[in-house]
Amino acid sequence: GIPQYPVREKGESDRTGTKVHFWPDHSIFTATVYKKETLEGRLRELAYLNKGIRITLTDLREVDESSVPYSKSFFSQGGIIEFVEMLDQNAGRNALIPRVIYVEGKDDHTNVAVEVALSYNDSYNEHIYSYVNNINTIEGGTHVSGFRRSLTRVFKHYGEREHLFEKAKVEIEGDDFR
């Protein structure tokens, strides 16, 4: 929407956080009715992607018998680790390794931070969820291609170093690890 006024300081407070109210502007948005379930899914996802923050959805369109509006909060202390666990659990996939593999790092020179959480499960198919700046990159991208290549390279190097592939009669490929 259009800002009503510039950001202004209101004074000191012992409260923290940001409160956002959203009312779609009919002159900007063609669709101004949103499904609560869609919003809940996105806010739940954001809570996993930003561990430690609480996001609350209040839907003033829906009130209970006491005129209290519908409200639901989303919070994740474990972040993307919990996200991977939830995705596997909701899909009925069983983890082959008891703990989610988690790696994070930041390049101080480029100021690029990366978080990776992965789980090997009993599903035949690969399920990759990738995000850049909290936006789901559904179609992948160079970051996903680079991750797949690196994962393959690391596993192949480890397997060769540990002589795990000596009896294999075929070339081990990336799909064998994914």
What spans do the regions from the language model cover?
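GHKL/Bergerat-fold ATPase module in large chromosome/replication-associated machines
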Residues: 58-177
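Short, well-ordered loop/turn elements at secondary-structure boundaries
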Residues: 15-16, 49-51, 110-112, 176-178
